[in-house]
């Protein structure tokens, strides 16, 4: 099952995340199927490729709870 989830990168104590599509059984920093954005919780900077996200969600990809909240804040998902 494919999931839309966060992949950590950055330095120690300075996390930054990429929004990626990957198998649910793949480890957190494993190889993604596709990268659709990024999020930096320290600077609150984020970018989401709306076209790719909508495409993957239409294919049935499930976002994790954290990613769902991020997309809801950026008005990409309506409840």
From Swiss-Prot:
It is found in: Plastid, Chloroplast. Disulfide bonds: none annotated. NCBIfam families: S16. InterPro entries: Ribosomal_bS16, Ribosomal_bS16_CS, Ribosomal_bS16_dom_sf. It comes from Thalassiosira pseudonana. The gene is rps16. Keywords: Chloroplast, Plastid, Ribonucleoprotein, Ribosomal protein. This is Small ribosomal subunit protein bS16c. One of its GO terms (molecular function) is structural constituent of ribosome.
